[in-house]
């Protein structure tokens, strides 16, 4: 089983309870090292295998997931914020679907929500705006060449 887990906006105490429990139970954690606070790895059990995906290609990440599934081990794929928002998980889920590997998604607190909390602001105001548009600059996080 592969669990896609949102790490939240950075502070270790802002990960969800479910996300923390999955990290504590995982046999393997693959985390986005260039983006995820490494303090979250302190939740891992002593014999957990940990990979920094910033140093891996997509195929290498998928190979680890496949190996763990074959060994009946639980993998957490730890993404920054919420994995469904700019997390690039679709390509991973498509590959897992093709291989018949089960997975689920545990949402995280996205940084745009964390920013509103820090600023004591709200994004929607009655009679003013009921719309939130989330966008970012074009581009991808660099990955190693195959």
Residue ranges of each PLM-predicted region?
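Class I S-adenosyl-L-methionine
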Residues: 1-109, 113-114
